[in-house]
Amino acid sequence: MNTNDLLTIGGQSFSSRLLLGTGKYRDFAVMQDALGASGTQIVTVAIRRVELKAPGHDGLLDALDLDRFQLLPNTAGCRTAEEAVRVAKLARAATGVSWLKLEVIPDPKYLLPDPIGTLRAAEILVGEGFTVLPYVQPDGVLARALEAVGCATVMPLASPIGTGKGLRTPELIRTVIDGAGVPIVVDAGLGVPSDAAQALELGADAVLVNTAIAEARDPVAMARAFALGVEAGRLGYLAGRMQQRDSASPSSPAAGVVRLPDPEVPA
C-alpha cells in the first residue's frame, strides 16, 4: 500500500481507511483485539446522557487507547436536531473531543436519518467549533449542502443500519462521491469485506463498519478481512478499472495462430 495515500479529515491524516464502531461486541477484550486486527485509527462511540451514568457503559473509554485512536463520539439515539446538538455538547464536555459523528434518526423502524434535521444540526455544530461527520442517506444534493456549511466529511449509508445488505444503491452513492470536496465515508449496512471493497472501488474515501465485525463468528478475523477488503478496493480504484464492453474481446490476439486444415469427411 502506498504510505503516502492518506485519508485526511479535519486537518488530520490517517493511513487506514477503515473506521470502526465499538458496539455489539461480546466483551471489551474481543473489541480491543478486533480494533487491533483492523488497523483502524478512528473509532466511534455512542455517548448519550443516560449511558454516561449507566452501569455497563463505564469502562468503554478506558478500554480504548486514546493515544492510538482518534475518538469519534456519535449522537446515536437522537431523534431531533436539537437533541443531537445537546448530546454533542455533552460528548465534548465528557471527552474533550470536538469530533462528532452526527446522527439524527427519528425513524425507529428503519433507522433512516433525517436530512433536514441533520443539515440544521450540522450548521449549528460547525458554528460551535465541532468537526462534523454527518450520517445521511445517499443524496448528492444534500451532500453538497452539508459540505457548504462546513462538514468535514459526508457519510452516506450503504443500506439501513445493521442489515448487512451491502451497497443497495451504488448509483446514488456515486452521486455523493462525484464532485465531492470532502472525504466520503460509506457507513452502515456493510456485511462482508467485498462490500467495503466495492465502496472503495466506487471512489469512496473510507468506510465505517461495526455490526458486520462485532457479530461475526470470529470478529478478529473479520476485522482483518475488512482491512484487506478496504486495501484491495482502494488499490483497484487508484489502478483504474478496464473499460466495460458490450461484446467479448479476446485476451490473446488471433493473428499468428496456426490453423489446421479441416479433417476430410469420408464419402
Swiss-Prot record:
Q: Which GO terms describe its cellular component?
A: 2-iminoacetate synthase complex; cytoplasm
Q: Which Gene Ontology BP annotations are present?
A: thiamine biosynthetic process; thiamine diphosphate biosynthetic process
Q: Mention any Pfam family matching this sequence.
A: ThiG
Quote the catalytic residue positions: 101 (schiff-base intermediate with dxp)
Sequence positions that bind 1-deoxy-D-xylulose 5-phosphate = 162, 188-189, 210-211
Q: In which pathway does it act?
A: Cofactor biosynthesis; thiamine diphosphate biosynthesis
InterPro entries from the UniProt entry: Aldolase_TIM, Thiazole_synthase_ThiG, ThiG
Question: Per the record, which residues fall in region Disordered?
Answer: 243-267
> Which keywords describe this protein according to UniProt?
Cytoplasm, Schiff base, Thiamine biosynthesis, Transferase
The source's superkingdom equals: Bacteria
**Record text on subunit structure and interactions:** Homotetramer. Forms heterodimers with either ThiH or ThiS.
PANTHER family, per the entry: THIAZOLE SYNTHASE (PTHR34266:SF2)
Name this protein carries in UniProt: Thiazole synthase
Protein's organism: Deinococcus radiodurans (strain ATCC 13939 / DSM 20539 / JCM 16871 / CCUG 27074 / LMG 4051 / NBRC 15346 / NCIMB 9279 / VKM B-1422 / R1)
